[in-house]
Each structure stands twice: as structure tokens, then as C-alpha cells.
């Protein structure tokens, strides 16, 4: 049985938290800042918009996932 939406979101948060963990996390993820991620967020937002404009629901689902990943990553970077 697939996880509920709430469980899936928590799983994503857990994965990104591990990537950002100072003890063994991913070096690339650890060095990211809000400012360094701006271009990635904009790119994903444009890809979401393109999928909407083209009526490509399958691609939209994929791009929304990519944008959500960026939102979670941004939210786990402490200000």
C-alpha cells in the first residue's frame, strides 16, 4: 500500500534533513544557502509553468515534485 500524502511529505523532509546533516550529509546540500538556490527554484517554477501551459499533466506532476524538493530544501536552511 502506498504511503499517505502526509507520510510521503514526511519521508521527503527526512531525506532532505539527512542530506543537510552536518554529520555525514551531502557536501553539496550542506553548502547551499537561500541565495544559492534561487536559480534552481526559478528554473523549477518555469518548468511547472511550461507543463501547465502545454497541458502536460504527467510532466506537471514531475515538475511539481522537483519544485517541492526545492521548497523543502529552502525551508530546512536555517536563517
Q: What are the functions of these language-model segments?
A:
Residues 70-74:
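Alpha-helical scaffold segments in carbohydrate-active enzymes
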Residues 1-59:
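Extended low-complexity intrinsically disordered regions
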Residues 77-79:
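Conserved small/polar residues in nucleotide/adenosyl-binding loops
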Residues 65-69:
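Glycine-centered tight-turn and secondary-structure capping sites
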Residues 62:
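Short, charge-patterned binding micro-sites
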Amino acid at each position: 500500500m502506498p504511503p499517505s500524502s502526509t507520510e510521503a511529505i514526511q519521508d521527503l523532509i527526512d531525506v532532505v534533513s539527512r542530506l543537510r546533516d552536518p554529520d555525514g550529509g551531502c557536501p553539496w546540500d550542506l553548502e547551499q544557502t537561500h541565495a544559492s538556490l534561487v536559480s534552481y527554484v526559478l528554473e523549477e517554477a518555469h518548468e511547472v509553468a511550461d507543463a501547465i501551459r502545454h497541458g502536460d499533466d504527467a510532466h506537471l506532476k514531475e515538475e511539481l515534485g522537483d519544485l517541492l524538493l526545492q521548497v523543502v530544501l529552502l525551508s530546512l536552511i536555517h536563517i
